Amino acid sequence: MGRGKIEIKRIENATNRQVTFSKRRGGLLKKANELAVLCDARVGVVIFSSTGKMFEYCSPTCSLRELIEHYQTVTNTHFEEINHDQQIFVEMTRMRNEMEKLDGGIRRFTGDDLSNLTLADINDLEQQLEFSVTKVRARKHQLLNQQLDNLRRKEHILEDQNSFLCRMINENHHQAAVGGGDVKAMVEMAPVLSMLTAAPAYYGEESSSTALQLTPPLHAVDAAAAAGFRLQPTQPNLQDPGCSSSSFHAAAAGHGLQLW
């Protein structure tokens, strides 16, 4: 029973196409070898698959190069030899022309080479420069607005800190006044007052809405605290002769101090 005829057309299925290629390639190379051996013929076969892979066969009595040279001699055809030096020269010339063109454009934009420009070219150049200046100014204003926003945020933060510290000072003054001069509150507020006193040096000499206005100042608080009470050393030889023990205890009790 004979095989049915296969329609000669491209096989659409990739797997079937690859299988058919492998079978037909093997058969073709086998036939070429049989022809070269049986008939003492000079046979050369070069095959490229659809993926670009190369397969070749040449009869044992010669090389593929010899077959190609013989083919050129018989048909009087010659393959064009590639002159790499010529290709390099052409590429260098193209790059040199491109560099000169770019350099000329830079000189025109900087105003160093305007002698060869016509009136229309100068008008086009002017429009391009004005467009570039507009873009630069827009970017400049954007950066300035960002800096202003950052400064405003910092100002609000400093104002909040200033308000918080002022409230703390007022509350401690109020507690000290109600408690009859609470020395402990004054001592606790000393680091805060020192920090607030040093604030102008930290933020600079400029006057702003964030400057701290303190009432009373630190030296006034220290003077009031010193005038409100007087402590005597515990050792007898260091005590003030003019201050008796009873008066000392009374003064300490009046100011809310506990003696250990």
UniProtKB/Swiss-Prot annotation:
MF-aspect GO terms: DNA-binding transcription factor activity, RNA polymerase II-specific; protein dimerization activity; RNA polymerase II cis-regulatory region sequence-specific DNA binding
Domain MADS-box positions: 1-61
Protein name (Swiss-Prot/TrEMBL): MADS-box transcription factor 29
Protein localization: Nucleus
Pfam families: K-box, SRF-TF
Role description: Probable transcription factor.
Keyword Nucleotidyltransferase on entry: no
Tissue and organ expression note: Expressed in developing seeds.
Gene Ontology CC terms, in alphabetical order: nucleus
PANTHER family, sorted: SERUM RESPONSE FACTOR HOMOLOG
Gene3D superfamilies: Transcription factor, MADS-box
Domain K-box, residue spans: 85-175
Alphabetic keyword roster: DNA-binding, Nucleus, Transcription, Transcription regulation
Biological process terms in GO annotation: positive regulation of programmed cell death; positive regulation of transcription by RNA polymerase II; regulation of transcription by RNA polymerase II; seed development; starch biosynthetic process
InterPro entries tied to this protein: MADS-box/MEF2_TF, MEF2-like_N, TF_Kbox, TF_MADSbox, TF_MADSbox_sf
Predominant location category: nucleus
Source organism per UniProt: Oryza sativa subsp. japonica (Rice)
Nucleus found in the keyword field: yes
PROSITE patterns, per the entry: K_BOX, MADS_BOX_1, MADS_BOX_2
